[in-house]
Amino acid sequence: ARQAASLYAATRASIQQREFERARTLLARLADVTRSDPAAARQARLLSAELELAAGNPQRTLEILAGSPPQRPELVLQTQARLQASKGPDMTNALQTWLATHPRDATVWQLLAATYRQNQQPLRAVRAEAEAQVAHLDYGAALDRFRAGQELVRQGGASASDHVEASIIDTRAREVQAVLKEQAAER
């Protein structure tokens, strides 16, 4: 376990220093050490995916993650890889499904915003950015983003199919405004 921890830390440091060949060498050793422990092997596989993503190899990242159970780390890495490969919109449904049961996951809201932007859906992207701020409990920033969405609709920057999204933005803006008023009253 100690050797695995040391190899993991050394690999992560090499990735951060952008020494990808050294990281791959360390990762191969880590894979050997963790082979008999499924949980540790999963962590090594996730680190391998992170390495390839950092090295600019999104397709290799997706290959490493293929067949992995749909847990949050895999979802985040797959989305980042698809965004890097300009295929972010492929992950929209999976991200929305995750957020239906984990609405306070700011990272996933930000990834959803990026997929919407890549798919030329600015109003949805602004709403997702606002929801990320709500998840961070930064209601002031969230209200700013919701207002930006309302302004986008007023300026005609939203498509006709965005009517439902505009309604959601209006409702969420009112809810966030109410929270801000409550917080101000408590002070």
Question: Over which residues does each language-model region extend?
Answer:
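Extracytoplasmic and endomembrane cell-envelope/extracellular-matrix remodeling and assembly machinery
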Residues: 1-64, 70, 155, 171-174, ...
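Alpha-helical linker/edge segments of TPR/alpha-solenoid repeat scaffolds
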Residues: 54-60, 85-93, 119-128, 157-160, ...
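Residue at a conserved register position within TPR or TPR-like alpha-solenoid repeats
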Residues: 14, 52, 82-84, 116, ...
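Structural register within alpha-helical repeat arrays
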Residues: 10, 48, 78-82, 112, ...
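TPR alpha-solenoid repeat register
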Residues: 6, 40-44, 74-78, 108, ...
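Alpha-helical junction/boundary sensor with strong preference for TPR arrays
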Residues: 34, 69-72, 102, 136-137, ...
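Alpha-helical adaptor scaffolds
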Residues: 46-56, 62-120
